[in-house]
Amino acid sequence: MIRRLLYLCLLLHSLSTFCQTFDTDTIAPQAVPAGHRFSPRQLVLPGALVAAGTTGLFQPVMAWKYELQDAVHTLGGQDRFPFEDYVQYVPALAAVSADWLGVRAEHGTADRLMLSATSYAVTAGFTWALLKRNVVSIRPGIHYTYVASGRTDEISPDANPKYFNSFPSGHSATAFMGAELVRLEYGREHPWLAVGAYAVATGVGVMRIYHDYHWFTDVLAGAGMGILGARIGWWLLPYERRLFQSLFKNDIAIRPVTDGSGAVLALSLTF
């Protein structure tokens, strides 16, 4: 019992030290580097893309959307292998690893991993949790298979939800998120790398249309969501870095502990 109390005291000591060392001033807004500060102008491009993509959900634009997809559908892309299932991750992978090839990045590997994880979480939250689960929009391939042939009684949003979650394009969101991260990390000194990443992301969007998985407007909205997710991750990075630095400034000590009947070594770890 005494030994357990001693361990508890050590734990409480560690927690109290943590509370004393954690300083909220370390994540104060004035400490944010200029390149990471929020600016309303940075919302213009992703906002415009999302707004343009959203118009495809309304009747005046919907007719034009169907006409465009009709032309694409005649190319027969619905039977091709969807390699964009894998290519969508190439820009994000480049954002994390391009400096391993000698290209200077704005941040170290740990920061880039944290930036990518945050950006992906935000993008997925917007794209999947918020929109795909709540906006009913039939996929082009399903439209041509069932609706255009008069077989609408065979499918429904409740019974076949994956057939009706076309808006927005998740693949496009992932690809453009990665492309924007490449631009932010490397674009200042290596603009060609940003251009290449955006070219890959654009190719992913085009393939989603060609393969009858998405309408053109789905891709626009997905691109906007991806760019916005990357920029939110970029804005949050200084706060996350300082938060984790505060949490993981570890003090490790090994102390002898005795209760009269024996002695042990106790590890004290302060987060």
Sequence positions of predicted segments:
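Aromatic-anchored segments of alpha-helical transmembrane domains
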Residues: 51-55, 124, 200-208
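Membrane-embedded catalytic cores of phosphoryl/pyrophosphoryl-handling enzymes
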Residues: 145-259, 264, 268-269
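Transmembrane alpha-helix/helix-exit interface in multi-pass inner-membrane proteins
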Residues: 122-142
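Alpha-helical transmembrane segments of multi-pass membrane proteins, especially transporters
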Residues: 115-120, 222-223
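N-terminal targeting leaders of membrane proteins
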Residues: 1, 8-104, 112-116, 132-134, ...
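Extracytoplasmic/secreted envelope proteins and their assembly/folding machinery
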Residues: 94, 110, 114, 127-128, ...
